[in-house]
UniProtKB/Swiss-Prot annotation:
Lineage of the species this protein comes from: Eukaryota, Metazoa, Chordata, Craniata, Vertebrata
Subcellular localization(s) per the UniProt record: Cell membrane
Primary location class: membrane
Pfam family, one: KPBB_C
Membrane topology qualifier: Lipid-anchor
Any one biological process term the GO annotation gives: generation of precursor metabolites and energy
Lipidation (S-farnesyl cysteine): C1220
A GO CC term assigned to this protein in UniProt: cytosol
GO MF: calmodulin binding; phosphorylase kinase activity
Protein name, as recorded: Phosphorylase b kinase regulatory subunit alpha, skeletal muscle isoform
Length: 1223
């Protein structure tokens, strides 16, 4: 008989430990583990972590088996793991209706429960009686389901369960924008049931999504139908938000020890090694004690000062928990595992020794890990005075199974029984390893042979869309529809993935669908519902952004491939040459670099072997040959009747998968290019006619299916020109001189409404006026009046032969102004028609997810409305309309700016540093004011000029303002594109002699306002007559420069800088932490009557985002941005006084009073130097001298000089005598 090896003996010891501390509690029926002897409920998160030691021990036995009994032991342990994981699966699958609802609502009431009955798998508390929404719990289950399946365990048994897991993927993929209650189930640390965005949830969701992608849940016994699919763009959304949050944990927690599970085992969710180390150091520095780590600062759980009879805390009560937070040995187990995975033996040894010292010996000397260590009630004051000196006592669960399991797992790995690769078979531990450089492959395709010839003349050789066959080219919208059928299961009433826009990572792959290769064009080319895609420069900008994004975020096997089609809209007016912006972009891509990205252009067929290709197995046909039963009626009567137009109800989400399947079937069956060789025989007579009818039916049906899936430019994707939808024309008169029309944009338009004998508006006469006018602006204004007075569906009877509703006429007019790129009218009509801004709600969510609150409309409240949580599209647009006070153009411009802000947030998040609230109304006002200041024009003219900027010019102007650089605006004297307005050149100060490269992009903005001076149309010098109606195009932003005379270019520089910083809410680095210190030495800060009380420091810590937002809410009561910035400077001076070793600097400090004292000191000194009243004119709104606004912060006459004197004067009774003497 073979003797037992030493390793076998050690494993037997661990097996006894696991049995005595974990498995003895496992329910024999459900496999679930109760939280403790007292708490019989089974928490999802605790169960998953608690079973890891069992899983690890099973792997160790499998690896180190000395005899058959060891193999049997390994199997027994592994089946205990499977039993628990399936028990949790049964708990969740019983709530399948909640999974379905949550995909669309993201509501806390629709979330899966966090805990279940250990014996029955049933729920134990109501939906609203617990903080159930804990995305990290669902995510950690999915993560280890993937890891365990990859290690060889067979947990999922049926395709129904596969579909349920696929829907759990949809459940967690929106974690980056979903506020939940977090790993500690409390949400906001005030414990008042307020959900918030948690880094621990976002990070764990990212890890789970990456682990499950392309994983076969049946393991080696699986097939195409058991594979899980994850969209890469959702993963990258999570990564972006996670990076913006860390090292913070949430809005209310500046650091949290739970982040160890995100930056290290098990998630390994962060790719930036420096951010990983920074986060770990923050935890060690701020949370580590003698017995473990606190969960987060001011955590009251089980402290002597916590009232066990109250569920929630009072906000000011949190200060009582400072320095006496309970310490959890659990987190030292994470440090041990982190040391093992990183190969840091010294760290492993250090924390093992520390952990051994806090373990409690149970019966027979079994080491038990307590839940936490607390300060004894009678020694609280002593701990307050000298933190980390009082000996603490163990409290809570014993053992804490979560911690006990990780302790055993860490010991197994530290002793070499398990290698990192065995517990991490999906290799997540390599997340911080540098990735190879990405080369973006770009395939340029021509829509037609004519465009191909034009490109060839320019030295650019491409294929047409028809020539790339058998590869199919489709718009991104189709891919979104295809994915909407993923995870569908009628028996479980699961609808699949909610329809969402497809990101650039998704469209940069090739797809194998039914043994055919598909490529999808980028989403921004498919944005025909909104006007951004009408601007070729904007298309180039979005392409540049996507290429840069791909280079930094691509993590898949193979290279990304972008299919970039060139359509007729990308040609010049005459259609004989390519737009200069598009041509320049194509040449740069051919050179190998564009937008900082390495690019390789070539044929699509050449990229097949190097591209990332995904097999969409869920679209594969079933046994009958097709995924869905289909019945095409191809007879002539069917075509003649026109019923084919109503075959599919595109509004029904439930049938969306059927529609896509039918569309793809028809596409594959009927759009193959016909051979060019002459046929050997030719049908004649009736046969030939029936064949033609058959082809016509096929193509018409295919076009219809495409249109019902909202595919624009159908002819661009189908190899036929037989059927192109023609928009009905109502023959509104074109302008006889379109260029002159374009050159004279209307700033203020008056419509003289015709009246009948009773004094009512004569609508027939108004329609006749519409028919006779050739002015596009006047046509738009008349249609707006008809829209508001009669409604969009009113039939104007413009022509007797057919209906001509107001909506139809506006749509036709929108097409006309779109062709000539009249951006002011495009925005105006878009606002009237309420055209949907593509991904507006997603843009808003992206900004909010980066902890940026938004406001729309101009201050003060209630006109300025704050957006602090994601809103549905309809609610968001309604809020913007209300804040815009009915001005359609301002409303649509607000939405446009929100989209641009989200673009910059995604590519250049550094632009938004130290900005916690983006005030879009003020940003637009500053844009208009800058135009007014630099062009010496009125506010109304500047507003009209702003409205006439092309989208690309608007986006670049926004970048200048966000970047904080000094820039100038001037009219260009050079003629520009005849289509559009004169150029307004926007450049950085001092960049006159810049190189050609520097003059492009950010350094030189060429926009398209008209080539003549701004002037008004139809503005009579007389007062407005009673029959005159003003249209919303007359709206403008107030400007301080309406009557400003020309002045030296340097004059006004500092006032402009303060206005920009104030509008953007930009503050100095560390400003909020300094305000926190000031509040500790006074009773509060008063700004325009609103008080920021010192009690906030008892609730919030200096580094909390929540505190920063609280300070912002007080400062934002000030409507004038430059005045707000002076108040910020005054508070900065107070922070310097707060550093002095004195107990108090006053009671409630009125900050605006300090500013006015400084203003008086400034005026006195300037008068003694001979300044007259004209030079010392005051701003009527704030009473501050405009010259003080324009003073530099430093220097003898700097604002800080006067503010320092004023602050010392204001608080002098609290200051030491020596300080006062310095005045």
């Amino acid at each position: 008989m073979r003797s037992r090896s030493n390793s076998g003996v050690r494993l037997d010891g661990y097996a006894r430990l696991v049995q005595q501390t974990i498995l003895c509690h496992q329910n024999p029926v459900t496999g679930l583990l109760p939280a403790s002897y007292d708490q019989k409920d089974a928490w999802v998160r605790d169960n998953v972590y608690s079973i890891l030691a069992v899983w690890g021990l099973g792997l160790a036995y499998r690896k180190n088996a000395d005899r058959d009994e060891d193999k049997a032991k390994a199997y027994e342990l592994e089946q205990s793991v499977v039993k628990l994981m399936r028990g949790l699966l049964h708990c969740m699958i019983r709530q399948v209706d909640k999974v379905e609802s949550f995909k669309y609502s993201q509501s806390t009431k629709d979330s899966l429960h966090a805990k279940y009955n250990t014996k029955t798998c049933a729920t134990v508390v109501g939906d609203d009686q617990w903080g159930h929404l804990q995305l990290d719990a669902t995510s950690v289950y999915l993560l280890f389901l993937a890891q365990m399946t990859a290690s060889g365990l067979h947990i999922i048994h049926s395709l129904d369960e596969v579909n349920f897991i696929q829907n759990l993927v949809f459940y967690i993929e929106a974690a980056y924008k979903t506020a939940d209650f977090g790993i500690w189930e409390r949400g906001d640390k005030t414990n008042q049931g307020i959900s918030e965005l948690n880094a621990s949830s976002v990070g764990m969701a990212k890890a789970a999504l990456e682990a499950l992608d392309e994983l076969d849940l049946f393991g080696v016994k699986g097939g195409p139908q058991s594979v899980i699919h994850v969209l890469a763009d959702e993963v990258q959304h999570c990564q972006s938000i996670l990076n913006s949050l860390l090292p913070r944990a949430s809005t209310s927690k500046e650091v949290d020890a739970s982040l160890l599970s995100v930056v290290s085992f098990p998630a390994f969710a962060v790719e930036d090694s420096q951010l990983v180390e920074l986060t770990k150091q923050e935890i060690i520095t701020k949370l580590q004690g003698r017995y473990g780590c606190c969960r987060f600062l001011r955590d009251g759980y089980k402290t002597p000062k916590e009232d066990p009879n109250r569920l929630y805390y009072e906000p000011a009560e949190l200060k009582l928990f400072e320095n006496i937070e309970c310490e959890w040995p659990l987190f030292w187990t994470y440090f041990i595992l982190d040391g093992v995975f990183s190969g840091n033996a010294e760290q492993v040894q250090e924390y093992k020794e520390a952990l051994e010292a806090v373990l409690i010996k149970g019966k027979n000397g079994v080491p038990l890990l307590p839940e936490l260590y607390s300060v004894p009630p009678d020694r609280v004051d002593e701990e307050y005075q000298n933190p980390h000196t009082v000996d603490r006592v163990p409290m809570g669960k014993l053992p804490h199974m979560w911690g006990q399991s990780l302790y055993i797992l860490g010991s197994l790995m530290a002793e070499g029984f398990l290698a990192p690769g065995e517990i991490d078979p999906l290799n997540r531990r390599f997340s911080t390893v540098p990735k190879p450089d990405v080369v973006v492959q770009v395939s340029i395709l021509a829509e037609t042979e004519e465009i191909k010839t034009i490109l060839k003349d320019k030295g650019i050789y491409v294929e047409t869309i028809a020539e790339v066959y058998p590869i199919r080219v489709q718009p991104a919208r189709i891919l979104s529809h295809i994915y909407s059928s993923l995870g569908c299961n009628n028996r479980m009433k699961l609808s699949g993935r909610p329809y969402r826009h497809m990101g650039v990572l998704g469209t940069s792959k090739l797809y194998d669908i039914r043994k055919t290769i598909f490529t999808f064009t980028p989403q921004f080319i498919d944005q025909q519902q909104f006007y951004l895609a009408l601007d070729n420069k904007m298309i180039v900008e979005m392409l540049r952004t996507d290429l840069s994004y791909l280079c930094s975020r691509w993590r898949m096997t193979g290279q990304p491939t972008i299919t970039f089609p060139i359509s007729h809209s990308m040609l010049d007016e005459d259609g004989t040459s390519l737009n200069s912006s598009i041509l320049a972009a194509l040449r740069k891509m051919q050179d190998g670099y564009f937008g900082g990205a390495r690019v390789q252009t070539g044929k699509l067929s050449e990229f097949l072997t190097t591209s990332c290709c995904t097999h969409l197995s869920f679209m594969d046909p079933g046994p009958e040959g097709k995924l869905y039963s289909e019945d095409y009626d191809d007879n002539y009567d069917y075509l003649e009747s026109g019923n084919w137009m109503n075959d599919y109800d595109s509004t029904s989400h439930a049938r969306c998968g059927d529609e896509v399947a039918r569309y793809l079937d028809h596409l594959l069956a009927h759009t193959a290019p016909h051979p060019k060789l002459a046929p050997t025989s030719q049908k004649g007579g009736l046969d030939r006619f029936q064949a033609a009818v058959q082809t016509t039916c096929d193509l018409m049906s295919l076009v219809t299916k495409a249109k019902e899936l909202h595919v624009q430019n159908v002819h661009m994707y189908l190899p036929t020109k037989l059927f192109q939808a023609s928009r009905p024309s109502f023959n509104l008169l074109d302008s006889p001189h379109p260029r002159q029309e374009n050159q004279v944009p209307s700033v203020r338009v008056e419509i003289h409404l015709p009246r009948d004998q009773s004094g009512e508006v004569d609508f027939k006469a108004l329609v006749l006026q519409l028919k006779e006018t050739s002015s596009l602006q006047e046509q738009a204004d008349i249609l707006y009046m008809l829209y508001t007075m009669k409604g969009p569906d009113w039939n104007t009877e413009l022509y007797n032969e057919r209906s001509a509703t107001v909506r139809e006429l506006l749509t036709e007019l929108y097409g006309k102004v779109g062709e000539i790129r009249h951006w002011g009218l495009i925005r105006y009509i878009s606002g009237i028609l309420r055209k949907k801004v593509e991904a507006l709600d997603e843009a808003c969510t992206d900004l909010l997810s980066h902890q940026k609150h938004l406001t729309v409309g101009l201050p003060p409240e209630p006109r300025e409305k704050t957006i602090s949580a994601p809103l549905p599209y309809e609610a968001l647009t309604q809020l913007i309309d209300e804040a815009s006070e009915g001005d359609m153009s301002i409303s649509i411009l607000t939405q446009e700016i929100m989209v641009y802000l989200a673009m910059y947030m995604r590519t250049q998040p550094g632009l938004f540093a130290e900005m916690f609230r983006l005030r879009i109304g003020l940003i637009i006002q500053v844009m208009a004011t800058e135009l007014a200041h630099s062009l010496r024009c009125s506010a109304e003219e500047a507003t009209e000029g702003l409205m006439n900027l092309s989208p690309s010019a608007m986006k670049n102007l926004l970048h200048h303002i966000l970047s904080g650089k000094e820039f100038g605006v001037e009219r260009s004297v050079r003629p520009t594109d005849s289509n559009v307005s004169p150029a307004i050149s926007i450049h950085e100060i001092g960049a006159v002699g810049a190189t050609k490269t520097e003059r492009t992009g950010i350094m030189q903005l060429k926009s398209e306002i008209k080539q003549v001076e701004f002037r008004r149309l139809s503005i009579s010098a007389e007062s407005q007559s009673p029959g005159t109606s003003m249209t919303p195009s007359s709206g403008s932003f107030p400007s301080a420069y309406d009557q400003q005379s020309s002045k030296d270019s340097r004059q006004g520089q500092w006032q402009r800088r303060r206005r920009l910083d104030g509008a953007l809410n930009r503050v100095p680095v560390g400003f909020y932490q300094k305000v926190w210190k000031v509040l500790q030495k006074c009773h509060g800060l008063s700004v325009e009557g609103f008080v920021l009380p010192s009690s906030t420091t008892r609730e919030m810590t200096p580094g909390e985002i929540k505190f920063s937002v609280h300070v912002e809410s007080v400062l934002n009561r000030v409507p004038q941005p430059e005045y707000r910035q002076l108040l910020v400077e005054a508070i900065l001076v107070l922070t310097m006084l707060a550093d002095i070793e004195i107990h108090s600097i006053g009671s409630i400090i009125a900050v605006e009073k300090i500013v006015h004292i400084a203003n008086d000191l400034f005026l006195q000194e300037q008068k003694t130097l001979g300044a007259d009243d004209t030079m010392l004119a005051k701003d009527p709104a704030s009473g501050i001298c405009t010259l003080l606004y324009d003073s530099a912060p430093s220097g003898r006459f700097g604002t800080m000089t006067y503010l320092s004197k004023a602050a010392a004067t204001y608080v002098q009774e609290f200051l030491p005598h020596s300080i006062c003497a310095m005045q």
